[in-house]
Amino acid sequence: MGRGRGGYTEKQPSYKDSGGHKVTDKGAIFVAERYMDQGYEAVFRRRHDPDRGCDLTIKTSDDENIVKNIEVKAITSNNPSKISTRIGEAAGQISEGDTVAIFFPNHRNSQTGRTLAEAGIAEARRKGYVKGPIEVWFSDKTCEHY
């Protein structure tokens, strides 16, 4: 056997960034797959490039027009202060007008999840960490825009 419990039901895709390195950031992969489901192209930015700017570039399906640049942070904390800090880290890595996406792998899009996200976002905006758009992705593959 040797494949661990359960094995795989399907082949797991392996993504590479623009520098040819394997992408291991589960949050970036999750957000990219959601945009691919909507018909967009997702380009993973090179991790080892200090000037990379963002995790993902989302393009139209014809690969011509850039829709948006996104910096993704996966957040497992239930503390709004820690969430705002992670949002600030993401905002510090991107240009003005680019999008910050936060991914909650442990929360569904419920009142509890939205309240937690809104508290963290409100604190991040109050502290001046971020002025641009923020996307909140939940484990049930839904998104809220702030």
Describe the residue ranges of each PLM region.
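Charged, structured surface patches that assemble and position nucleic-acid processing machinery
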Residues: G2-C54, K68, V72-Y146
